Amino acid sequence: TENQEIALAKIREAAGNGARLIVLPEATSQNFRSGRLDEQAQSLEGPFATAIQALAEELEVTVVAGMFCPADTVERDGKTINRVSNTALIAGPGVLGGYDKIHTYDAFDYRESDTVLAGESLVAFDVDDLVVGAATCYDIRFPEQFKELASQGAQLIVVPTSWADGPGKLEQWRLLTAARALDSTSYIVAAGQSRPGGDAEAGNPSGPTGIGHSTIVDPNGVRVAEAGYEDDILYAEIDPNEVAKTRRTLPVVTPAD
């Protein structure tokens, strides 16, 4: 698909510039308005995930990218609905897994749970000497998930996102990404789908189709990098020692036994 080819090209570009962990947005495989999700959903053994994983293996990097996997079938209002999981694919050398979004986006007159089965499990993985936790989009409104990931050892939390635009939504996004970094004393790497229509549509209600403004926030809530409404690639050096230092001076996270 076109999305897949764009994703592969961006991964290759980022890896060529030295990236070790590459984070793409929620719904990288296809956006929420590209047709019925259940008709496009693929397993982790399907062509989208295996193409990402093959390139990650070749480049010796770890990639996180949003996709949809078949989940369950429910009956609602006399209709049979094949729901999907909103999955953050995690792919790298010898690694092929995923995190299923726990908090479905049932807000602002939208009900993701009608078509998406909520996940149940926290997920963390290693990249070099870094422990990375996973969350997706609406999860960022739930600080306990981020604190629990940090208590389990996560030093950085990735957040693939397709953040709906509208009045105040960019301000909320900026506040929430900084707040979750402070709550968890972790780096936050939040990759958002770019805004359809770019700056010209900024602030107009859009549904879950992206607001751009991908960002990297350090454990002290300082924004290290931020994109605009358009496509971009952000880079940052991640220092585990900065996490350790912050957690010594601001001990708000209790390590799990």
List PLM regions with ranges.
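Cys-nucleophile CN-hydrolase/nitrilase-fold catalytic domain and related Cys-dependent amidase chemistry
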Residues: 5-92, 98, 164-186
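CN hydrolase (nitrilase-like) catalytic-core segments centered on the catalytic cysteine
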Residues: 45-64, 140-234
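Short beta->alpha transition motifs characteristic of CBS
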Residues: 30, 37, 89, 99-105, ...
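Short beta-strand scaffold segments in enzyme catalytic cores
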Residues: 65-67, 86-90, 123-125, 214-216, ...
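Active-site catalytic loop in hydrolytic enzyme cores
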Residues: 54, 73-152, 165-175, 179, ...
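Short, basic/aromatic-enriched C-terminal tail that caps enzymatic domains
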Residues: 235-257
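Short, acidic/polar
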Residues: 2-12, 141-147
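Short hydrophobic-aromatic micro-motifs
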Residues: 22, 131-136, 158, 188-189
